[in-house]
């Protein structure tokens, strides 16, 4: 299946149903009074995270989602039916952005999580609501309010503990194949990896972590060179980044300059991402003898001003890989994810005596005069007292 990590959609909540103007007409009850019912609330539009999905490709073709309108009120104090909600299922890891405001509405980070993205309109009031001691035959009603309408940008961001950084052909995919059951394509030409992939690294029966491989970066990626930086967003939720450096590039490029390019492109994309913990990992040390590899790695680290620990591995032969993975596992255990508090979603209600309806009644009351019935030509026929 084609991997699609961005999609734009339109969501429209249902309008509220209008209130009804009606009077009770029944045999032997000549002055039945008002019995117009309220309208129904409009349906809402929800997002729901589904772990069985792994791409947004469906929303490249289906771009509009509309909830049902609330039914109008009816006579005999019948309230209109509430409009049906629409639920849009997205992969776990999807970020929802309002394109109109640029606001991030929410991150769908766990299976079954729901997010309200468009609220249905409020119902209108029937004329029964406007009955009072001075207005026995009200002919007022209110219409339902429009539902929310939004253009949303959906961004799928892979949920991984560890992210891989590096130039094309640095050995990122080979590393993923060596430590997990994932089988990304590996070849001796740049940009073999065209889409992100995930691998689960199992250290033992109880300990494991997820590593993400993204296409390599080149100079000018922030301006769109190569595959650009569109895949860097998949590293935003990672707890640690492994910066793979080809210690002996086959194309004769300078490893120090290659590393600086990656750091520069990372900073151009996001200062927050650049500030994440980043480990230096020298790959392909099997191409050199042990002493030469150690000396070259030390020289590169000094040229980069790197003072922390660095690792020497060979993803192809497995040399040094296990020790690196155990250190990563220890780091992940010692630095658990801080879960953001999930926003409480409003509950569905069939009727809510809210500020909107209260304001509508007050506006009608202000327009009434002290002698309401004299302004109503047919009012005498409907006035009654107990």
UniProtKB/Swiss-Prot annotation:
From the record, what ranges are coiled-coil? none
User: What GO MF annotations does this protein's record show?
Assistant: GTP binding; GTPase activity; magnesium ion binding
Q: What class of enzyme is it?
A: hydrolase
What is the required cofactor set for this protein? Mg(2+)
GO biological processes: ribosome biogenesis
Which parts of the sequence belong to the Obg domain? 1-159
- Which residues hold GTP? 166-173, 191-195, 213-216, 283-286, 314-316
The protein's Enzyme Commission number: 3.6.5.-
Outline the segment boundaries, as ranges, of region: Disordered. Answer: 127-147
Q: Which domain of life is it from?
A: Bacteria
Q: Which SUPFAM superfamilies match?
A: Obg GTP-binding protein N-terminal domain, P-loop containing nucleoside triphosphate hydrolases
Compartment(s): Cytoplasm
According to the UniProt record, one GO cellular component term is: cytoplasm
Family designation: Belongs to the TRAFAC class OBG-HflX-like GTPase superfamily. OBG GTPase family.
On subunit structure and binding partners, the annotation says: Monomer.
Q: What is the designated name of this protein? A: GTPase Obg
Source species of the chain: Escherichia coli (strain UTI89 / UPEC)
